[in-house]
């Protein structure tokens, strides 16, 4: 099948005859569907993504529930057709035969990293690189993964960029600057500066949640979460003992958040790649770890005033969330610095 015609299916619904014809053409047996669990407290829709593939044909199609894709309320999940959002073309991949059809942009599975970059040179200003390379075309985003050494293509993934969430319909309160937030790290809950900065966002109504969980969750609508802690050696939490440990800033849709509307430390942007982070921080991270099970990574930079913790996506090579952490927080390891879950 011509790759241009195949990629034209991105954005179409699973009930579209052209989509069904394509799945039949590649002998894909399963059909996309949301996962339902009526007994799950977060259900009944517990998974809005669905992937269907033919391993023998080396191709896989990804779909998402239409309501989830367009950012509608969770009560709408499962009531709309699913949107085709991505297509994988596999090369040297465990358990999957190589795709035998034409690849987009004249790519070949035998191409090495340098050749792939040359063939996609027209999109060079959009390239984000790390373990994989990612480019933006006018219609979609393409990610190319390589075998060890970059000698040939492991897979090429073409995916739609997520649409923006629907507008809120009301104005947000002004958010404090990142400089102001950093200055408050380690401050006690009764510090007037804490309330000057965060009361306009609704901090007072989260007092009980802070006492119970140590967290103030402003992810929706502010893209912000605050972690508080009680210093070691104390037992009963209180305003004079509870201190601001960290602040985490979220990209849109990350952990159900809306985008943090303020600035980020060191001029970081949510669209930055891991390579761009090193340039902006001025040096490699002090600690770094990638998790290929969920295609994310985390990097830490320690400074006397605060620690910067960045979680990024290794499939699209973009920052997902950024945390600033008090220097005396006791959090010196990566495993404890992923922010609120």
Language-model segments: residues:
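Interfaces and regulatory segments of ATP-dependent nucleotide/adenylate/phosphodiester-chemistry enzymes
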Residues: 9, 181-186
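N-terminal low-complexity, Pro/Thr/Ser-rich intrinsically disordered segments
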Residues: 170-181
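A cross-family detector of function-defining hotspots
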Residues: 2-5, 18-82, 91, 103, ...
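Aromatic-anchored, charged helix-turn/loop surface patch used as a conserved interaction hotspot
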Residues: 241-246
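Amphipathic/hydrophobic helical signal segments and adjacent flexible N-terminal regions
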Residues: 3-9, 178
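Short, recurring structural edge motifs at helix starts
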Residues: 100-105, 182, 261-266
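Preference for well-ordered, secondary-structure-rich cores of eukaryotic proteins
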Residues: 96, 256-257
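Eukaryote-biased recognition of intrinsically disordered, low-complexity regulatory segments
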Residues: 88-92, 248-253
């Amino acid at each position: 099948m011509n790759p241009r015609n195949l990629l034209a299916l991105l954005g179409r619904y699973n009930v579209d005859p052209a989509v069904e014809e394509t799945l039949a053409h590649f002998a894909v047996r399963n059909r996309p569907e949301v996962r339902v669990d009526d007994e799950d407290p977060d259900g009944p829709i517990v998974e809005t993504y669905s992937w269907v593939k033919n391993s023998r044909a080396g191709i896989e199609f990804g779909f998402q529930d239409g309501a989830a894709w367009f950012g509608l309320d969770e009560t709408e999940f499962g009531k709309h057709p699913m949107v085709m959002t991505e297509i994988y073309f596999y090369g040297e991949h465990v358990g999957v035969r190589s795709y035998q059809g034409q690849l987009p942009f004249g790519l070949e599975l035998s191409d090495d990293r340098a050749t792939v970059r040359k063939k996609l040179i027209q999109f060079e200003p959009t390239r984000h690189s790390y373990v994989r390379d990612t480019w933006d075309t006018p219609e979609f985003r393409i990610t190319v993964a390589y075998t060890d050494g970059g000698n040939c293509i492991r897979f090429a993934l073409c995916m739609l960029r997520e649409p923006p969430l629907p507008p809120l319909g009301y104005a947000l309160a002004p958010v404090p600057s990142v400089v102001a937030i950093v200055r408050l790290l380690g401050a006690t809950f009764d510090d007037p500066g804490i309330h000057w900065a965060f009361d306009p966002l609704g901090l007072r109504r989260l007092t009980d949640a802070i006492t119970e969980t140590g967290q103030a969750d402003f992810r929706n609508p502010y893209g912000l979460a605050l972690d508080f802690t009680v210093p070691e050696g104390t037992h009963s939490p209180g305003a004079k003992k509870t201190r601001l440990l960290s602040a985490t800033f979220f990209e849109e849709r990350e952990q159900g958040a809306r985008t943090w509307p303020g600035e980020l430390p060191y001029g970081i942007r949510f669209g930055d790649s891991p390579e761009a982070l090193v340039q902006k921080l001025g040096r490699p991270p002090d600690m770094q770890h990638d998790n290929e099970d969920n295609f994310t990574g985390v990097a830490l930079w320690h400074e006397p005033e605060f620690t910067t913790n960045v979680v990024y996506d290794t499939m699209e090579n973009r920052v997902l969330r950024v945390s600033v952490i008090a220097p005396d927080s006791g959090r010196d390891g990566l495993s404890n610095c992923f922010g609120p879950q």
